[in-house]
A protein has these predicted regions:
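C-terminal motif of bacterial Sec signal peptides marking the signal peptidase cleavage site
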Residues: 14-16
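A sequence/structural signal for flexible, mid-protein segments enriched
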Residues: 18-265
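Sec-dependent signal peptide recognition
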Residues: 2-10
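N-terminal hydrophobic targeting signals that begin at the initiator methionine
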Residues: 1-2, 18
Length: 265
């Protein structure tokens, strides 16, 4: 029988920084910020472009219009994106295949930006369960949700878990649950959702994303920078796979979803 391993110690938390630090800074040249992922869902693929804000104008992030945005697959088939709204570029015709390699190319204001993403092997949710939490747990009422998945031994895998209730991501404490299969390769893995309790008649959708490494690395760096975790004593820009000093990320992932209704015992 394969070992079932818990991921409690492999949960990375995404927290917000609340302290305001006043520093004298010179105005810097804005950089392009690229946000986009491809996945195996039938939804339109979206790439968002903006620029970093000026320190002296906090909260203002200019959108980037009139860019040329394309994605090319490993067979040389190019898909051009249309600007559906200012700064947002979409395609409904891009066909994404598992284990396929895709190259993003952006031309904006005389500059070229590129990134590559490889769609990972899809890992499915095995099952979902819920139970009364142990004594002295973080919450004393309601039920604790647990997701099980069988990690494939032939791949290095990176995951993100999202829980939805009434169509909205459910995470009252702002946690982002990402983990990999280090020390758990080829095993049945279970993750308990410790962020929020669930109650009778709740209908919960659980989404398991299998991430490519660049997306995982980006999320991991965001976690460490936001929370001051993992030895990040010298804050810097999050790790990215984008060229030409752009910020943000271009990633790929596959999706498995399952639904569970919480019934009273």
């Amino acid at each position: 029988m394969k070992t079932i391993l818990s991921l409690f110690s492999f949960i990375f938390l995404l927290v917000s920084c609340e302290d305001v630090i006043e520093i004298d800074l010179d105005s810097v040249e804005p950089k392009l910020v690229i946000e986009g992922c491809i996945n195996d869902l039938d939804d339109p693929c979206t790439i968002k472009l903006s620029k970093t804000g000026d320190y002296f104008e906090p909260g203002i992030y200019p959108i980037v219009s009139d860019a040329l945005v394309t994605i090319t697959d490993e067979n040389g088939i190019e898909t051009e994106f249309e600007e559906s709204e200012p700064g947002t570029y979409t395609s409904e015709s891009l066909e994404v295949e598992e284990l396929g390699s895709y190259t993003l190319h952006i031309q904006s204001e005389g500059e070229d930006y590129m990134a590559e993403g490889v769609v990972p092997h899809k890992v499915f949710i095995d099952s979902l369960s819920y139970d009364i939490p142990p004594l002295f747990y973080e919450f004393e009422e309601g039920y604790m949700l647990t997701c099980y998945l069988q990690d494939p031994a032939e791949y290095r895998n990176y995951y993100r878990l999202i829980v939805y209730k009434k169509g909205e991501p459910k995470s009252s404490d702002g946690m982002m649950y990402i983990f990999n299969d280090d020390f758990m390769n080829g095993n049945m893995i279970f993750m308990s959702w410790e962020s929020d309790p669930l109650f009778p008649q709740d209908t919960v959708v659980v989404e398991l994303q299998t991430l490519d490494k660049s997306t995982y690395d980006y999320y991991f760096t965001l976690n460490s920078l936001a929370g001051g975790m993992f030895g990040a004593s010298n804050p810097s820009n999050p790790e990215t796979n984008l060229s030409n000093d752009a910020l943000g990320y271009f990633g790929a992932y596959t999706v498995s979803r399952d639904t569970i209704v919480i019934l009273p015992n």
